[in-house]
Amino acid sequence: MEDVLEVYTRPEDPQHPRVCMDELSKQLVSETRAPLPLRPGQPRRYDYEYRREGVCNVFLVFAPLLGQRWVTVTAQRTYQDWAYLMRDLVDVRFPGAERVTVVLDNLNTHVGGALYETFEPAEAKRILDKLELHYTPKHGSWLNMAEIELRVLNGQCLDRRIGDVRVVKRESAAWEAERNAAEATVDWRFTTADARIKLKRLYPVAQPENSPSTVRVKRNTAKLGPTEAALRTRRRAHKQTRGQHELCHR
């Protein structure tokens, strides 16, 4: 958690831009009956029945210091889709940057190995060398600013029945252009100091130097004089002696 929060405190640097990346799955749904038109005092009304048209995946890369975001809609979510997104990030969005810092969640497709699954080894290494990946902790995806932008995208644009992936692409592109023109960003205020106070329960409790548990560990450590080989010899001899005693008793 503190690793991600530290990234957010870094100053703007054109050679080391900072972005957040997230994705969501959008279910495609079409109408089975035409909606009833608007009437005075009544909104447009939709039938409760609908038809499933599959799903698509929506990637969003957000640069909070620039007030820019880029939406990519794909037919599915695979290693290759994420790999192409990362190549586009370093070659198209920030071609002159030395390294791009990316905050993202620990989804199974968000790994460097995805680049090697998609490109030749030399190309995969070239892309990976230009990326600095910082993963949010488990159950900590709220630390990703891109998740906030995805909520805005869904609430303003995609939270309705859409049955065609081409419509999703067109609507997302229009939303992206409008938000980028306004240079909308996220006013992030949660810091490491806040985390250590408000999320204190998540931190391990440090033991005092002379606490009973610390003293017990020291005593147990002091008793470990012999080497591991000597200890194994003792255990082996003990087993043999115990076996001989059992034979005598029989």
Ranges and model annotations:
Residues 1-87, 199:
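Extended, low-complexity cationic-aromatic segments
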Residues 32, 167-234:
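C-terminal domain-tail junction helix/linker
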Residues 45-50, 123-145, 162:
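RNase H-like polynucleotidyl transferase catalytic core
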Residues 80-101:
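Short, basic/hydrophobic alpha-helical segments
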Residues 97-111, 137:
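Acidic/histidine-rich, metal-coordinating catalytic segments
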Residues 138, 146-165, 178-182:
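Active-site proximal helix-loop segment of RNase H-like, two-metal nucleases, encompassing DDE(D)
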